[in-house]
């Protein structure tokens, strides 16, 4: 959800008067609320794997009263293009994906060598396809994702979790979205934590409840003095709290996790 923010920022920069609404799963709302370019977060009530054409038709029809001028369809799946089609949105832009001719009427055919980065692919959709042939054609600098978090929120949330203001924070995200094969070993995290704590930092471990045990393994490898400067918050934060605390960190060390 964060990478597409570059598209929203680019659209806002090109069309300052445009009203940008985003349809996404309800859990994304805390992230979207930190994107000032986004006017409204519309919850997608259907699950990731569900086709449910009838429900998508009903959802699309419910959006017709908003009279959107353009839709940008970011997932590559066939079903993701159904709602804007049923909503009768005149211009429907996206990468071809699952052969979505007809559902999309501004179809881009992906050349992975020409567009190596996902963020570049999203930003390219904000421009006419005849102009943007490769990533080299994109205006620089790119508008990178940058969630808005205030200093007051950082201070308040750090106090909520009794994190010290005496030492700068380094965040670890030791879990992985797709299993242990993509995990940096916990003992490497532990060695890095020891080094950072001895250099004057505090270490904060982030993740879901399923990552809590991994965090405890990292903690267990530290001596008593070092443990005083390492907090395992995996499974203890809401998404919005995690976003704020990560923004308060000097750096993040992460696997290919959801928080990444």
Where do the language-model regions lie?
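Catalytic machinery of carbohydrate-active enzymes
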Residues: 1-260
